[in-house]
Protein backbone atom coordinates (compact mmCIF):
# COMPACT_ATOMS: atom_id res chain seq x y z
CA UNK A 1 0.00 0.00 0.00
CA UNK A 2 1.31 3.45 -0.90
CA UNK A 3 0.08 6.95 -0.21
CA UNK A 4 0.86 9.13 -3.21
CA UNK A 5 0.84 12.93 -2.94
CA UNK A 6 0.14 14.93 -6.09
CA UNK A 7 -0.34 18.42 -7.46
CA UNK A 8 -3.13 18.76 -10.03
CA UNK A 9 -1.82 21.11 -12.71
CA UNK A 10 -2.61 22.35 -16.18
CA UNK A 11 -1.06 24.22 -19.06
CA UNK A 12 -3.74 25.69 -21.34
CA UNK A 13 -6.19 23.32 -19.57
CA UNK A 14 -4.18 20.32 -20.76
CA UNK A 15 -4.39 18.79 -17.29
CA UNK A 16 -2.11 16.44 -15.38
CA UNK A 17 -1.31 15.00 -12.01
CA UNK A 18 2.25 16.01 -11.11
CA UNK A 19 3.89 13.36 -8.94
CA UNK A 20 7.30 13.87 -7.31
CA UNK A 21 8.90 10.42 -7.28
CA UNK A 22 11.50 11.27 -4.64
CA UNK A 23 9.05 12.75 -2.16
CA UNK A 24 6.72 9.80 -2.68
CA UNK A 25 9.55 7.24 -2.46
CA UNK A 26 8.60 5.63 -5.76
CA UNK A 27 11.79 6.18 -7.76
CA UNK A 28 12.13 2.41 -8.11
CA UNK A 29 8.76 1.97 -9.79
CA UNK A 30 8.87 0.14 -13.10
CA UNK A 31 7.47 1.62 -16.30
CA UNK A 32 4.60 -0.84 -15.93
CA UNK A 33 3.77 0.48 -12.45
CA UNK A 34 3.87 4.08 -13.67
CA UNK A 35 1.59 3.18 -16.56
CA UNK A 36 -0.90 1.28 -14.40
CA UNK A 37 -1.09 4.10 -11.87
CA UNK A 38 -1.65 6.61 -14.68
CA UNK A 39 -4.46 4.57 -16.21
CA UNK A 40 -6.21 4.29 -12.84
CA UNK A 41 -5.72 7.88 -11.62
CA UNK A 42 -6.35 9.59 -14.97
CA UNK A 43 -9.69 7.87 -15.57
CA UNK A 44 -12.21 10.69 -16.10
CA UNK A 45 -14.69 8.73 -14.00
CA UNK A 46 -12.38 8.86 -10.98
CA UNK A 47 -13.55 11.01 -8.07
CA UNK A 48 -10.66 13.41 -8.75
CA UNK A 49 -11.88 14.01 -12.29
CA UNK A 50 -9.05 12.26 -14.09
CA UNK A 51 -6.49 13.95 -16.32
CA UNK A 52 -4.74 13.78 -19.67
CA UNK A 53 -1.74 12.13 -18.03
CA UNK A 54 0.78 12.05 -15.20
CA UNK A 55 3.98 14.09 -15.02
CA UNK A 56 6.50 12.07 -13.03
CA UNK A 57 9.27 14.31 -11.66
CA UNK A 58 12.54 12.90 -10.38
CA UNK A 59 16.28 13.58 -10.24
CA UNK A 60 18.06 14.10 -13.54
CA UNK A 61 20.34 11.37 -14.84
CA UNK A 62 22.68 14.11 -16.10
CA UNK A 63 24.82 16.77 -14.41
CA UNK A 64 23.25 20.21 -14.71
CA UNK A 65 19.46 19.84 -14.97
CA UNK A 66 17.51 20.41 -11.75
CA UNK A 67 15.19 17.50 -12.47
CA UNK A 68 13.73 15.11 -14.98
CA UNK A 69 10.21 14.90 -16.43
CA UNK A 70 8.58 11.66 -17.54
CA UNK A 71 5.18 11.88 -19.21
CA UNK A 72 2.69 9.02 -19.14
CA UNK A 73 -0.57 9.49 -21.02
CA UNK A 74 -3.96 8.53 -19.63
CA UNK A 75 -3.87 5.28 -21.63
CA UNK A 76 -0.52 4.30 -20.10
CA UNK A 77 1.57 5.12 -23.16
CA UNK A 78 4.72 7.21 -22.85
CA UNK A 79 4.99 10.67 -24.42
CA UNK A 80 8.49 11.72 -25.43
CA UNK A 81 7.63 15.37 -24.80
CA UNK A 82 4.82 17.58 -23.51
CA UNK A 83 5.14 21.35 -23.77
CA UNK A 84 2.15 22.20 -21.60
CA UNK A 85 3.26 19.71 -18.99
CA UNK A 86 6.83 20.96 -19.06
CA UNK A 87 5.70 24.47 -18.12
CA UNK A 88 4.09 23.14 -14.94
CA UNK A 89 7.12 20.96 -14.17
CA UNK A 90 9.33 23.99 -14.73
CA UNK A 91 7.33 25.97 -12.20
CA UNK A 92 7.34 23.12 -9.69
CA UNK A 93 11.10 22.58 -9.88
CA UNK A 94 12.05 26.26 -10.05
CA UNK A 95 9.96 27.02 -6.97
CA UNK A 96 11.33 23.95 -5.20
CA UNK A 97 14.92 25.10 -5.83
CA UNK A 98 14.19 28.85 -5.45
CA UNK A 99 15.36 29.61 -9.01
CA UNK A 100 13.99 31.67 -11.89
CA UNK A 101 15.62 29.68 -14.70
CA UNK A 102 17.33 26.33 -15.15
CA UNK A 103 17.46 23.21 -17.31
CA UNK A 104 15.14 20.20 -17.13
CA UNK A 105 15.81 16.76 -18.57
CA UNK A 106 13.10 15.26 -20.78
CA UNK A 107 13.02 11.93 -22.60
CA UNK A 108 15.03 13.11 -25.62
CA UNK A 109 16.58 16.45 -24.67
CA UNK A 110 17.75 18.75 -21.89
CA UNK A 111 15.72 21.94 -22.20
CA UNK A 112 15.91 25.50 -20.90
CA UNK A 113 13.04 26.67 -18.69
CA UNK A 114 12.42 30.01 -17.00
CA UNK A 115 9.83 32.11 -15.25
CA UNK A 116 8.23 34.60 -17.65
CA UNK A 117 6.13 37.76 -17.53
CA UNK A 118 2.45 36.93 -17.06
CA UNK A 119 0.29 36.79 -20.18
CA UNK A 120 -2.47 38.44 -18.15
CA UNK A 121 -4.64 38.29 -15.02
CA UNK A 122 -1.55 37.63 -12.82
CA UNK A 123 -1.50 34.04 -14.05
CA UNK A 124 1.79 32.22 -13.27
CA UNK A 125 3.55 32.06 -16.64
CA UNK A 126 6.61 30.10 -17.74
CA UNK A 127 8.76 29.78 -20.85
CA UNK A 128 10.10 26.42 -22.00
CA UNK A 129 12.29 25.32 -24.87
CA UNK A 130 10.83 22.91 -27.42
CA UNK A 131 13.52 20.96 -29.27
CA UNK A 132 15.02 19.14 -31.11
CA UNK A 133 13.08 20.02 -34.27
CA UNK A 134 13.39 17.51 -37.12
CA UNK A 135 11.63 17.12 -40.48
CA UNK A 136 13.12 13.82 -41.68
CA UNK A 137 10.49 11.11 -42.15
CA UNK A 138 12.47 8.63 -40.06
CA UNK A 139 12.27 10.89 -36.98
CA UNK A 140 8.47 10.72 -36.82
CA UNK A 141 8.44 7.89 -38.18
CA UNK A 142 6.39 8.48 -41.35
CA UNK A 143 5.85 6.48 -44.55
CA UNK A 144 4.05 8.63 -47.15
CA UNK A 145 6.53 8.40 -50.01
CA UNK A 146 8.53 11.56 -49.25
CA UNK A 147 11.56 12.22 -47.06
CA UNK A 148 10.17 15.58 -45.89
CA UNK A 149 6.49 16.50 -45.87
CA UNK A 150 5.84 20.23 -46.22
CA UNK A 151 2.57 21.75 -47.43
CA UNK A 152 1.82 18.78 -49.66
CA UNK A 153 -1.38 16.89 -50.49
CA UNK A 154 -1.19 13.19 -49.66
CA UNK A 155 -4.16 11.62 -51.50
CA UNK A 156 -4.14 8.58 -49.22
CA UNK A 157 -4.87 10.91 -46.29
CA UNK A 158 -7.04 13.55 -47.97
CA UNK A 159 -7.47 14.68 -51.56
CA UNK A 160 -7.69 18.39 -50.71
CA UNK A 161 -5.78 19.21 -47.54
CA UNK A 162 -2.05 20.04 -47.70
CA UNK A 163 -0.05 18.55 -44.82
CA UNK A 164 3.27 19.25 -43.13
CA UNK A 165 5.00 16.92 -40.67
CA UNK A 166 7.60 17.64 -38.00
CA UNK A 167 8.94 16.04 -34.82
CA UNK A 168 9.61 18.27 -31.78
CA UNK A 169 10.59 15.52 -30.81
CA UNK A 170 7.13 13.89 -30.67
CA UNK A 171 5.49 13.60 -34.11
CA UNK A 172 3.04 16.13 -35.53
CA UNK A 173 0.94 16.22 -38.69
CA UNK A 174 -0.35 19.71 -39.47
CA UNK A 175 -2.76 21.24 -41.96
CA UNK A 176 -4.20 24.75 -42.31
CA UNK A 177 -7.97 24.83 -42.81
CA UNK A 178 -10.98 27.13 -42.82
CA UNK A 179 -13.88 27.14 -40.36
CA UNK A 180 -16.00 24.76 -42.44
CA UNK A 181 -13.34 22.04 -42.19
CA UNK A 182 -12.97 22.68 -38.46
CA UNK A 183 -16.72 22.21 -38.11
CA UNK A 184 -16.62 18.88 -39.99
CA UNK A 185 -15.59 15.45 -38.71
CA UNK A 186 -12.52 15.25 -40.97
CA UNK A 187 -10.00 15.73 -38.18
CA UNK A 188 -11.51 13.13 -35.88
CA UNK A 189 -11.77 10.52 -38.63
CA UNK A 190 -8.24 11.10 -39.93
CA UNK A 191 -6.61 11.27 -36.50
CA UNK A 192 -8.44 8.19 -35.23
CA UNK A 193 -7.25 6.26 -38.28
CA UNK A 194 -3.64 7.43 -38.00
CA UNK A 195 -3.57 6.50 -34.31
CA UNK A 196 -4.78 2.97 -34.94
CA UNK A 197 -2.92 0.38 -37.01
CA UNK A 198 -1.97 2.07 -40.30
CA UNK A 199 0.89 2.01 -42.84
CA UNK A 200 1.68 5.74 -42.77
CA UNK A 201 2.44 6.55 -39.12
CA UNK A 202 3.18 3.21 -37.44
CA UNK A 203 3.73 4.80 -34.02
CA UNK A 204 0.74 7.14 -34.35
CA UNK A 205 0.88 10.92 -34.67
CA UNK A 206 -0.55 14.10 -33.16
CA UNK A 207 -2.90 15.65 -35.72
CA UNK A 208 -3.52 19.42 -35.70
CA UNK A 209 -5.94 21.49 -37.76
CA UNK A 210 -4.94 25.16 -37.82
CA UNK A 211 -6.95 28.27 -38.67
CA UNK A 212 -5.33 31.60 -39.48
CA UNK A 213 -6.69 34.47 -37.38
CA UNK A 214 -4.30 37.27 -38.42
CA UNK A 215 -0.69 37.76 -39.45
CA UNK A 216 0.42 37.18 -35.87
CA UNK A 217 -2.25 34.81 -34.55
CA UNK A 218 -3.53 31.29 -35.23
CA UNK A 219 -6.03 28.89 -33.69
CA UNK A 220 -4.92 25.27 -33.16
CA UNK A 221 -7.00 22.17 -32.37
CA UNK A 222 -5.14 18.93 -31.75
CA UNK A 223 -6.02 15.25 -31.56
CA UNK A 224 -3.22 13.94 -29.36
CA UNK A 225 -1.67 10.54 -29.79
CA UNK A 226 -2.59 8.38 -26.79
CA UNK A 227 -5.21 10.84 -25.53
CA UNK A 228 -7.57 12.12 -28.25
CA UNK A 229 -8.85 15.69 -28.47
CA UNK A 230 -7.47 17.89 -25.69
CA UNK A 231 -7.97 21.54 -24.80
CA UNK A 232 -4.45 22.21 -26.03
CA UNK A 233 -1.15 20.54 -26.87
CA UNK A 234 1.98 22.57 -26.20
CA UNK A 235 4.27 20.83 -28.67
CA UNK A 236 1.52 20.97 -31.32
CA UNK A 237 1.05 24.71 -30.85
CA UNK A 238 4.81 25.15 -31.12
CA UNK A 239 5.05 22.99 -34.24
CA UNK A 240 2.09 24.74 -35.89
CA UNK A 241 3.67 28.12 -35.19
CA UNK A 242 6.85 27.01 -36.92
CA UNK A 243 4.99 25.72 -39.98
CA UNK A 244 3.04 29.00 -40.20
CA UNK A 245 6.27 30.99 -40.13
CA UNK A 246 7.76 28.78 -42.84
CA UNK A 247 4.68 28.93 -45.06
CA UNK A 248 4.70 32.73 -44.87
CA UNK A 249 8.49 33.13 -45.09
CA UNK A 250 8.04 35.17 -41.93
CA UNK A 251 10.68 36.37 -39.48
CA UNK A 252 11.45 33.67 -36.93
CA UNK A 253 12.21 35.91 -33.96
CA UNK A 254 8.74 37.50 -33.93
CA UNK A 255 6.36 35.89 -31.37
CA UNK A 256 3.12 34.34 -32.59
CA UNK A 257 -0.06 34.31 -30.51
CA UNK A 258 -1.62 30.86 -30.49
CA UNK A 259 -5.23 30.40 -29.40
CA UNK A 260 -6.74 27.08 -28.42
CA UNK A 261 -9.79 25.70 -26.65
CA UNK A 262 -7.86 25.95 -23.38
CA UNK A 263 -6.60 29.51 -23.63
CA UNK A 264 -3.69 31.30 -25.27
CA UNK A 265 0.10 30.95 -25.50
CA UNK A 266 2.95 32.63 -27.34
CA UNK A 267 5.55 30.84 -29.47
CA UNK A 268 8.81 32.16 -30.88
CA UNK A 269 10.93 30.23 -33.38
CA UNK A 270 14.71 30.60 -33.43
CA UNK A 271 17.42 29.37 -35.80
CA UNK A 272 21.10 29.25 -34.82
CA UNK A 273 24.16 29.70 -37.02
CA UNK A 274 24.22 25.97 -37.76
CA UNK A 275 20.64 26.03 -39.01
CA UNK A 276 19.24 24.21 -35.98
CA UNK A 277 15.71 25.33 -35.08
CA UNK A 278 14.33 25.61 -31.55
CA UNK A 279 11.03 26.94 -30.26
CA UNK A 280 10.16 28.93 -27.14
CA UNK A 281 6.71 28.25 -25.68
CA UNK A 282 5.29 30.76 -23.18
CA UNK A 283 2.08 30.07 -21.28
CA UNK A 284 0.39 29.44 -17.97
CA UNK A 285 1.50 26.93 -15.36
CA UNK A 286 -1.53 26.63 -13.11
CA UNK A 287 -1.64 24.62 -9.89
CA UNK A 288 -5.29 23.61 -9.45
CA UNK A 289 -5.10 21.58 -6.25
CA UNK A 290 -2.90 19.50 -3.98
CA UNK A 291 -3.93 16.15 -2.58
CA UNK A 292 -3.19 12.50 -2.00
CA UNK A 293 -4.46 9.05 -2.93
CA UNK A 294 -4.06 5.53 -1.64
CA UNK A 295 -2.74 3.06 -4.22
CA UNK A 296 -3.42 -0.50 -3.10
CA UNK A 297 -4.24 -3.71 -4.96
CA UNK A 298 -4.40 -1.81 -8.27
CA UNK A 299 -7.06 0.52 -6.85
CA UNK A 300 -6.55 4.29 -6.50
CA UNK A 301 -8.65 5.87 -3.74
CA UNK A 302 -8.89 9.60 -3.05
CA UNK A 303 -7.69 10.67 0.39
CA UNK A 304 -7.37 14.46 0.22
CA UNK A 305 -7.76 17.20 -2.41
CA UNK A 306 -7.49 20.90 -1.56
CA UNK A 307 -8.11 23.45 -4.31
CA UNK A 308 -6.01 26.57 -4.81
CA UNK A 309 -7.35 29.93 -5.97
CA UNK A 310 -5.44 29.82 -9.25
CA UNK A 311 -8.08 28.31 -11.51
CA UNK A 312 -10.36 31.32 -11.03
CA UNK A 313 -7.61 33.55 -12.40
CA UNK A 314 -7.18 31.32 -15.41
CA UNK A 315 -10.90 31.21 -16.14
CA UNK A 316 -10.82 34.98 -16.62
CA UNK A 317 -8.31 34.45 -19.44
CA UNK A 318 -10.39 31.64 -20.93
CA UNK A 319 -13.46 33.90 -20.98
CA UNK A 320 -11.49 36.57 -22.82
CA UNK A 321 -10.19 34.01 -25.34
CA UNK A 322 -13.64 32.54 -26.01
CA UNK A 323 -15.11 35.99 -26.61
CA UNK A 324 -12.32 36.74 -29.06
CA UNK A 325 -12.66 33.44 -30.91
CA UNK A 326 -16.39 34.02 -31.42
CA UNK A 327 -15.51 37.09 -33.47
CA UNK A 328 -13.34 34.99 -35.80
CA UNK A 329 -15.91 32.37 -36.79
Swiss-Prot record:
Biological or metabolic pathway of the protein: Amino-acid biosynthesis; L-lysine biosynthesis via DAP pathway; DL-2,6-diaminopimelate from LL-2,6-diaminopimelate: step 1/1
Binding residues annotated for substrate, in chain numbering: 14, 73, 83-84, 170, 206, 224-225, 234-235
Keyword Nucleus appears in the UniProt entry: no
One Pfam match: DAP_epimerase
Sites marked Could be important to modulate the pK values of the two catalytic cysteine residues: 172, 224
This protein's UniProt keywords: Amino-acid biosynthesis, Cytoplasm, Isomerase, Lysine biosynthesis
Chief location of this protein within or outside the cell: cytoplasm
Location(s) in or outside the cell: Cytoplasm
Top enzyme class: isomerase
Record's keyword annotation contains Nucleotide-binding: no
Gene3D superfamilies according to UniProt: Diaminopimelate Epimerase, Chain A, domain 1
GO biological process, one term: lysine biosynthetic process via diaminopimelate
Active site as annotated: 82, 233
GO molecular function: diaminopimelate epimerase activity
Catalytic activity annotation: (2S,6S)-2,6-diaminopimelate = meso-2,6-diaminopimelate
GO CC aspect terms: cytosol
EC number: 5.1.1.7
InterPro entries, per the entry: DAP_epimerase_AS, DAP_epimerase_DapF
NCBIfam families, per database record: DapF (TIGR00652)
Family: Belongs to the diaminopimelate epimerase family.
Function: Catalyzes the stereoinversion of LL-2,6-diaminopimelate (L,L-DAP) to meso-diaminopimelate (meso-DAP), a precursor of L-lysine and an essential component of the bacterial peptidoglycan.
PANTHER family: DIAMINOPIMELATE EPIMERASE, DIAMINOPIMELATE EPIMERASE, CHLOROPLASTIC
Binding partners and assembly: Homodimer.
Protein name from the UniProt record: Diaminopimelate epimerase
Provenance organism: Listeria monocytogenes serotype 4a (strain HCC23)
